[in-house]
Each structure stands twice: as structure tokens, then as C-alpha cells.
A protein has these predicted regions:
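Solvent-exposed alpha-helical segments within well-ordered globular domains of core cellular machineries
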Residues: 9-13, 27-31, 42, 46, ...
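Residue-level signal for pocket-adjacent positions within structured domains
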Residues: 28, 43, 56, 68, ...
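Cys/His-rich Zn2+-binding cysteine-cluster or related metal-binding knuckle/ribbon modules and their
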Residues: 2-8, 17, 27-92
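Conserved, well-folded catalytic cores of nucleic-acid-processing
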Residues: 14, 18, 36, 51-54, ...
């Protein structure tokens, strides 16, 4: 027997399908939303729809933005000759929080994972190689220290090495299997400063 009505169960199921939201959190959110004033729920749903409609990939680095270029790629004070390669926009945000990295980024939107059927053509590698035709001096590979992240880093290193562009990998200090988005700013900064050439 279902404890809640069809509408409540459906809302809980939809919320529980979001990453990082378990069943208890989904229930808590569902009850909160149901008890919110209708105008606030309407505003929230409109904001979600607007974001879905207007947010897209930056045409340069592939982070999420609502303009053609993200604020980082538009910023002429950034060092456009240094590109940090990250797996996702959350990792980019983690490095930006350090306030120390002055280059630009390239977001892969994933990592190579043969076990999951994700190959090099399934992430934004072709776009990265295209960017290297510009005035790029260094590529910093800042993928996660998971098996997939390490595989991706090695693949990128082998791909770029023949171009003569300096390729570095962030230092460890980031625990093996750790996701960058959960690492504190000091550890990320030390990993960036201690990067090694591939």
C-alpha cells in the first residue's frame, strides 16, 4: 500500500531521480514544495524552465552559460594561453573558488570509461584539440583522480604531447577516487601549484 497519494508519490519519485537526492530528501523537498505558497512554486518552476531554455554551452570552453561566451572566456585579463581541462562545470567552479588560477578552462562533460561505454568521442576532446590551434602554451589536466579521470588524463597527454604544447597534470593531494568538487580550496591550490609535466 502506498503511503502517499499519486501526485505526492510522483513528485517524490521525480525529485529522487535527481543526483545526490535520496528518498528521504526527496520526501522532505516534496512536502516543502507542496506547503509553499502557489506564487513561489510558480516562480520556481518558471525559473527552472527558463534555465533549461536559455542555458547552453559556452562556444569556447563548454561550461554552462546563458551567453555565447561565458564570463571567464570573455575576460581579457585571463591568461588564454593556459587551459585547464576539467571533467565538469562543478570542477571548474571548485578551482574558481581558490581565486588563484588565472587561465581559462575546457570542460569535457565526462571522462573516458570503457566499462560504461564512454569513449573519447563521447566527451569534448575534439573541441579541445581544435582550441589548441590557437596560441596555447600549456594544458593543465585537472581530471579527477579516479580510474576514469586518470585514463582520460593519460589519453589527453598522449594526444597533445606531439604538438609541443606543455602538458601538466595536477599533483596528488587530491585523494584517489576523490571528486574535485568536494575538495577544499587549499588542497586544490596545492594540487595546481604542484602539477607535473606529462
Amino acid at each position: 500500500m502506498d503511503l502517499y497519494s499519486g501526485y505526492i508519490n510522483k513528485l517524490i519519485d521525480e525529485l529522487a531521480a535527481l543526483p545526490g537526492i535520496g528518498n528521504k530528501s526527496a520526501q522532505r523537498l516534496a512536502f516543502h514544495l507542496i506547503n509553499m505558497p502557489k506564487d513561489k512554486v510558480t516562480r520556481l518552476s518558471k525559473t527552472i524552465l527558463d534555465a533549461k531554455e536559455h542555458v547552453r554551452y559556452c562556444k569556447e570552453c563548454y561550461t554552462l552559460t546563458d551567453d555565447e561566451l561565458c564570463p571567464i572566456c570573455r575576460n581579457e585579463k585571463r591568461d588564454h594561453s593556459t587551459i585547464m581541462v576539467v571533467e565538469n562545470t562543478r570542477d571548474l567552479a571548485a578551482y574558481e573558488k581558490t581565486g588563484k588560477y588565472e587561465g581559462v578552462y575546457h570542460v569535457l562533460h565526462g571522462a573516458i570509461s570503457p566499462m560504461l561505454g564512454i569513449g573519447p568521442s563521447d566527451i569534448k576532446l575534439k573541441e579541445l584539440i581544435e582550441r589548441l590551434k590557437g596560441d596555447v602554451q600549456e594544458v593543465i589536466i585537472a581530471t579527477n583522480s579516479s580510474l576514469e579521470g586518470e585514463t582520460t588524463a593519460m589519453y589527453i597527454g598522449k594526444l597533445i604531447k606531439p604538438t609541443g604544447i606543455k602538458v601538466t597534470r595536477i599533483a596528488s593531494g587530491v585523494p584517489v577516487g576523490g571528486d574535485l568538487e568536494y575538495i577544499d580550496e587549499v588542497t586544490l591550490l596545492r594540487a595546481l601549484e604542484g602539477r607535473t609535466e606529462l
